[in-house]
Amino acid sequence: MFARRCGRLANRFVRLKSTSATSPITYKALHANSPLPRCRIIEPPRATVPEAVSNIIMSTPFNRVQRPKRHVFNCLVQNEPGVLSRLSGILAARGFNIDSLVVCATEVENLSRMTIVLRGADEVVEQAKRQIEDIVSVWAVLDYTGTSMVERELLLAKVSLLGPDHFQEHFERSEKVAESTNAKAKSDGEGVMNANAALQLRASQLAAINQLTTLFHGRVADISTETIILELTATPDRVDNFLSLLRPYGVLEACRTGTSAMTRAPHSNEVTEEAEDDVEVEEVFLPPG
């Protein structure tokens, strides 16, 4: 009886197609005595101790190779011949690639300052520093790595005003002379049109380069009909960014002086904090106990 009744209700449910208000009652009557199937629980496999240790070893990442750290040395040396060769020989013997080396005189007579920027491991750099200090002509070696300092580098860059399409014209002088002789045989009207197009090209190129130089607080050192020389004094990273932005315009020549560094003066708040730490408190003002 119950199965026959369920069959009738099922046929009625099919005819209604879940549009009637009594469709939920029909559904509950059909599925009242049918329990929902239980989800099968799959237990994870239990690994043994050797398998667990092997899994941990295989999943542990390897130690990444540390990049060579950037070191900045400031050497105070005697102003005499042969000091630079002895110092560079020590660095070359240990395989250092010197990023920058600047030598200049100081305000003191017979005293020069060398600013060296190199990359290498801390232990190897420390050994090279001690060997440099052992040179007779070296007064002191100051390590500015990790300290608050001011770094500046001067850049002179010659950029083309003809655009990237005419970049090779600066290196092909013979073809340029031949083209200029052939251009004289052309009509005056065609020559005026080419001159106007070249003038507009130079003006747009000059405006874009000048705007970029202004954003980096640089200045124009020299300008001609085909090239412009830019001057920028900034940090080494800022100079690298400026050069990368100038490359699409066509950099003909670039000259960098190298890094000059000088430590910053301590701030007033740092001095006061150190002074407060050194103040001794009298026992009278201490709490009891």
Curated annotation (Swiss-Prot):
At what positions is Phosphoserine found? 34
Q: Which GO terms describe its molecular function?
A: acetolactate synthase regulator activity; enzyme regulator activity
Q: Where in the cell is it found?
A: Cytoplasm
Quote the PROSITE patterns the UniProt record gives.
Answer: ACT (PS51671)
User: Does the record's keyword annotation contain Chloroplast?
Assistant: no
Question: InterPro entries attached here?
Answer: Acetalactate_synth_ssu (IPR004789), Acetolactate_synth/TF_NikR_C (IPR027271), Acetolactate_synth_ssu_C (IPR019455), ACT-like_dom_sf (IPR045865), ACT_dom (IPR002912), AHAS_ACT (IPR039557), AHAS_small-like_ACT (IPR054480), ALS_regulatory_subunit (IPR053050)
Q: In which pathway does it act?
A: Amino-acid biosynthesis; L-isoleucine biosynthesis; L-isoleucine from 2-oxobutanoate: step 1/4; Amino-acid biosynthesis; L-valine biosynthesis; L-valine from pyruvate: step 1/4
- GO CC list: acetolactate synthase complex; cytoplasm; mitochondrial nucleoid
Q: Name one Pfam family in it.
A: ACT_AHAS_ss
ACT domain mapped to chain residues: 72-149
* GO BP: branched-chain amino acid biosynthetic process; isoleucine biosynthetic process; L-valine biosynthetic process
Main subcellular location of this protein, as a coarse class = cytoplasm
- Record has Cytoplasm as a keyword: yes
User: What keywords tag this UniProt record?
Assistant: Amino-acid biosynthesis, Branched-chain amino acid biosynthesis, Cytoplasm, Phosphoprotein
Family to which this protein belongs: Belongs to the acetolactate synthase small subunit family.
The entry's function note states: Stimulates activity of the acetolactate synthase catalytic subunit ilv1.
Which NCBIfam families does the UniProt record give?
acolac_sm (TIGR00119)
Official protein name in the record: Probable acetolactate synthase small subunit
Annotated organism of origin: Schizosaccharomyces pombe (strain 972 / ATCC 24843)
